Each structure stands twice: as structure tokens, then as C-alpha cells.
Amino acid sequence: MKVLLANPRGFCAGVDRAIEIVKRTIDMLGTPIYVRHEVVHNRFVVDDLKQRGAIFVEELHQVPDGATVIFSAHGVSQAVRRQAAQRGLKVFDATCPLVTKVHLDVARHCRTGRDMILIGHAGHPEVEGTMGQWDQERGTGRIYLVENIDDVAALHVAQPHHLAYTTQTTLSVDDTRNIIDALRQRFPTIQGPKNNDICYATQNRQDAVRELARECDLVLVVGSPNSSNSNRLSELAQREGVASYLIDSAAEIDPAWVIDKHHIGVTAGASAPQVLVDGVLARLYELGATSVSEHSGKPESMVFALPKALRLQLVD
């Protein structure tokens, strides 16, 4: 049984930045430090930060007045930002810069009075934050959410000739392309972003899984069940005709999965650390793996700057 590692896999620049923001804030200011929502969608990462002193909450009313709060990588609505300011909270923003780009795009279309369509998954925190950039006090029009082609067919917009779209950053590239095609067919004058809003890491990891699926008869995706990009990786492998499972850690591997399997692919979502992948490889060796090799893959060199207040050199 041979194991093939996807490349790239695991942490992206936005996740690296978000985790480092929490760690540095704790180091510089001490505890307690509050984090609104899981800073990234990975149980191992969140548990590690809890042990360091981070307190995770879902809403700002759980944060004491005047305390320090970090916004997660998924971003927050304008209403949350206003509430934080009104309550005198000290805020560090771990929103991924690629999500911020989408937020700015939505705000720009709001100011021009266009209607806006967001392609995304209802209930996901990134979608809630992006929908919340639409400020009725600063513009007219409306923002609509579509999740699939059927939603596009059923959609009724107030301004079909004054319309734009954007997307959640962690979607299936293939699904999103099909939805955009449906939007353009129904609304020929719709405006889109200059560049694809699917993030580079999402695109690269999906391309890598597609390569794995061509060579493997099983693909294991390391990632938490609430991770959008991790779920998309497992779904993509299945669409390519390969059995695939999303696992939080090596402990979730069922030995029955690898029976009669000759080539097992392993990848990790953008919020899953390498230490979890290492644990999966160790478990696969216990189950009979004889070798591990790695695809050459697409190099990633993206680095996002920390907030200015956290760039100061820490002094022991």
C-alpha cells in the first residue's frame, strides 16, 4: 500500500496570519483574550489556542466591556464592528485579506446602488460577514444569496440591469463556475469581480486533489467537519470517482477503509496543521503502508502582514 501526499495542502497564508494574531495578542497583552467565533475551522487549532488562554465566543455580548477581542479569519459584518466600537472593545482583526477584498467589493457596489448577488453557503460565518457589508444607510439596492443553479433560476431581483455578483472564497471551483455561467445567462449585463474571488489556496488544493484522484483508490482529507474548504476537497475526490473521507485526525481512520487499497491519497484543508497529517501517515504505516511520496505541486509563497500593532518585536 503506497501513500501519495497532495501538494499544496494544509495551512494557507490567511490561516497562518489568523493563528499568529491570536498567539501574539496573548503574548503581548496577556489573558483573557476573546475571539469571536473559531478563528479558523479546526478543532486541534482551537483547542491549542484555548490552552494558551484564548476564550472563544459566538457573539460580542459574551465579551466584557473594554476587553480585547479578535475577529476570526472569516470576517464580520459592519454591525458587529459598530457594536465593538460602541462598547469600547479593543479589536484585532484576523479577517483573511482575501475575504476583506470581497467585503470592499460588496461595499463599493452598495454605494453605487447596484443589487448584489453573493454565491455562498447559507449560515457560514464568511457569508454572514459578507452579507453584512451591505449598508442600507449608505446605498440603495439589495443583496441576495444563491447556493446553486436552482437558486439562480428562482431568483427575482429588483434591478436586473444594475446587478453584480461575488463569491464566498472557499467554494467548489467547478460548482461556482457553473453558477456564474447560469447568472450570466439569466442576467447578461451582470458585473463580476476582475479576478476570481475563490482564493488561491482553495483553487490550488482542489487542483491537487484532482491530481490525487487520478492515481489513488482512496483519498483521506484532514480537516474538521465545519471547514468549508475541507468538505469541498472530499466532495471533489468523490466526484472524480474515488472513495474519500473527511477526518479530524488519525483516530477517525477506519481500518476497513484501506482493505484492498493500493494507492491512498492524503491531503489537508487550509485550516488543518501538518502535525495532523503526520499522525495520519503514522497510522497508515501501522495499517500496512509501505511508502510515502509527494506530488511536486504548485509552490505557494503568499504571506499576509500582521496588524501593525502586532508587528512590534516581543521582548522577553
Curated annotation (Swiss-Prot):
Any single GO BP term: dimethylallyl diphosphate biosynthetic process
UniProt xrefs under Pfam families: LYTB
Residue sites binding isopentenyl diphosphate per the record: 41, 74, 124, 227-229, 271
Top EC class of this enzyme: oxidoreductase
Cofactor: [4Fe-4S] cluster
Keyword Iron-sulfur: yes
EC number: 1.17.7.4
Binding site for [4Fe-4S] cluster: 12, 96, 199
Cross-referenced CDD domains: lytB_ispH
Residues annotated as transmembrane: none
Signal peptide positions (record): none
Pathway: Isoprenoid biosynthesis; dimethylallyl diphosphate biosynthesis; dimethylallyl diphosphate from (2E)-4-hydroxy-3-methylbutenyl diphosphate: step 1/1; Isoprenoid biosynthesis; isopentenyl diphosphate biosynthesis via DXP pathway; isopentenyl diphosphate from 1-deoxy-D-xylulose 5-phosphate: step 6/6
Residues annotated as binding (2E)-4-hydroxy-3-methylbut-2-enyl diphosphate: 41, 74, 124, 169, 227-229, 271
Gene Ontology molecular function: any one: 4-hydroxy-3-methylbut-2-enyl diphosphate reductase activity
PANTHER family xref list: 4-HYDROXY-3-METHYLBUT-2-ENYL DIPHOSPHATE REDUCTASE (PTHR30426:SF0)
Job description of the protein: Catalyzes the conversion of 1-hydroxy-2-methyl-2-(E)-butenyl 4-diphosphate (HMBPP) into a mixture of isopentenyl diphosphate (IPP) and dimethylallyl diphosphate (DMAPP). Acts in the terminal step of the DOXP/MEP pathway for isoprenoid precursor biosynthesis.
Family designation: Belongs to the IspH family.
Descriptive protein name: 4-hydroxy-3-methylbut-2-enyl diphosphate reductase
Gene of this entry: ispH
